[in-house]
Amino acid sequence: MKQNINIGNVVDDGTGDYLRKGGIKINENFDELYYELGDGDVPYSAGAWKTYNASSGQTLTAEWGKSYAINTSSGRVTINLPKGTVNDYNKVIRARDVFATWNVNPVTLVAASGDTIKGSAVPVEINVRFSDLELVYCAPGRWEYVKNKQIDKITSSDISNVARKEFLVEVQGQTDFLDVFRGTSYNVNNIRVKHRGNELYYGDVFSENSDFGSPGENEGELVPLDGFNIRLRQPCNIGDTVQIETFMDGVSQWRSSYTRRQIRLLDSKLTSKTSLEGSIYVTDLSTMKSIPFSAFGLIPGEPINPNSLEVRFNGILQELAGTVGMPLFHCVGADSDDEVECSVLGGTWEQSHTDYSVETDENGIPEILHFDSVFEHGDIINITWFNNDLGTLLTKDEIIDETDNLYVSQGPGVDISGDVNLTDFDKIGWPNVEAVQSYQRAFNAVSNIFDTIYPIGTIYENAVNPNNPVTYMGFGSWKLFGQGKVLVGWNEDISDPNFALNNNDLDSGGNPSHTAGGTGGSTSVTLENANLPATETDEEVLIVDENGSVIVGGCQYDPDESGPIYTKYREAKASTNSTHTPPTSITNIQPYITVYRWIRIA
């Protein structure tokens, strides 16, 4: 934080900083600048990137304006983005993968409550090697970044391209499969090799435990994948099959439909390490018969699909209990395949976990993986699944049934050119309104349809439900609007003094703008004489007046006025309600019924 030197009011008045204190502030200011803009000693005009290691913690609380080089070699990292305000629009946070580890241990972006990432509140996983993110905070509380941008390239598409090649071995002892895709490189970060139906192990990085790699310069040498050739560590027999499958550009799109997780098992008696989600699981392997799926580092909001789950122990595909002739239940303590006979023989009829079984929660979401296998220190469990049932062998009609429940039928996009955003949620209306650049809206999601029906600034009313609309519509940010006031249509005729001008949006000269949002009126009014027309009584009357010219009740010509009793009058108009000062005010309120009124602000 910047420190200012207090120079006092006049020379040597004793109110300013003394020389040493001023020097300390200067040094601290420069130290902070040199650290934020460089390595602490030298400023970098190209920008200063601070390294963050997963070993320092799996959660990084990002700060405005900072740049992070994130090393996930030891585990996944979640980036919690800061909560912004209108004043934070256009502020930037950068993150990149210079260690080439995000494809192995991805980074997950999490927006603060009320904010979104590209319009969605769901966390976003970035699992592309050499990813280069520039996160910009935009209106209204929305983080934006360029997809598919990497340090070494920008991929041309976000569409997942899958290439697959199968080989039937015709030469005994064959290990090499050269130029697999005939001049086209495969993705070294996403490639699957199967030998006789069993998926071979490669690992996060190439090692002596890898079952395959690429040919080296020396005879029989196995080296890291080169993007073109494949060499197996173990030779094949005639008639064996080898399948090679790779996922090209659009890895993020592919991962959204196909997900892979793996962990290495470590015996707590043989290591001092602790469990790290998505990387290692430390426990007493001699007694371990289950493992929670959370140990695989699952993304919130992206659960495992049990219909397409595949489990592999050390690269060998396992079968679900109850399938391929394997029992769903078995007899423990006796030799029997029948529940009744098992009980008679003194056994216990229990659910089988051979090869494995899955325990789910009340919503059918997998929670725990059970098995009968005994694992050793360093063994690997690999799980893969499609996030929807389209990845399984559904019929066309079954696919249509599933997609009808999940997706919106997409028609042609429409050009949007008049959309607006609010820039101040506390002062709703002009001048706190900004235009949105023209774009095309595709109707491929319910949220897009909602944006069309209820754009920013839309007023919504409900007669009985007092709750914020987001709690029952599921979309948008809403705020109570126009409490205790009625709505009047804005007049495009600027000469209308009441309903054409906005007295809440004044220019530098104090003149109101020709926009909606003007306010006025009152619930009651007190009438004044100026509000009344001239009035008088229909007939003249006699009014008591000592100086009146009309005498009633006495002699008209009594010189000394000592004769009979009389009263003098004059002719004039009569007054009314002379004591009503001030008069009672008049209520202007028309017959009404109240409703809950909201305006969409974001």
Curated annotation (Swiss-Prot):
InterPro entries to which the protein is assigned, alphabetical: Baseplate_gp9_C, Baseplate_struct_prot_Gp9/10_N, BP10_T4, Gp10_C, Gp10_D3, Gp9-like_sf, Gp9/Gp10_mid_dom_sf
Positions of region (Disordered): 501-523
Induction: Expressed in the late phase of the viral replicative cycle.
Subcellular location field: Virion
Sorted UniProt keywords: Disulfide bond, Late protein, Viral baseplate protein, Viral release from host cell, Viral tail assembly, Viral tail protein, Virion
Regions of compositional bias (Polar residues) in chain numbering: 501-512
Any matching Pfam family: Gp10_D3
GO BP term, example: viral release from host cell
GO cellular component: virus tail, baseplate
UniProt cross-references to HAMAP family, sorted A to Z: BP10_T4
Family membership noted in the UniProt record: Belongs to the T4likevirus baseplate wedge protein gp10 family.
Function: Peripheral baseplate protein that is part of the tail fiber network. Connects the short tail fibers to the baseplate. During infection, the baseplate undergoes a conformational change from a dome-shaped to a star-shaped structure. At this point, gp10 rotates and acts as a lever that unfolds the short tail fibers, which then interact with host cell surface receptors. Involved in the tail assembly.
Quaternary structure and interacting proteins, as annotated: Homotrimer; disulfide-linked. Heteromultimer with gp7; a gp10 molecule is disulfide-linked to gp7 and the other two remaining gp10 molecules form a disulfide bond. The gp10 trimer interacts with gp11 trimer and with the short tail fiber (STF) composed of the gp12 trimer. Part of the baseplate macromolecular complex which consists of gp5, gp5.4, gp27 (central spike complex); gp6, gp25, gp53 (inner baseplate); gp7, gp8 (intermediate baseplate); gp9, gp10, gp11, gp12 (peripheral); gp48 and gp54 (proximal region of the tail tube).
Protein's UniProt name: Baseplate wedge protein gp10
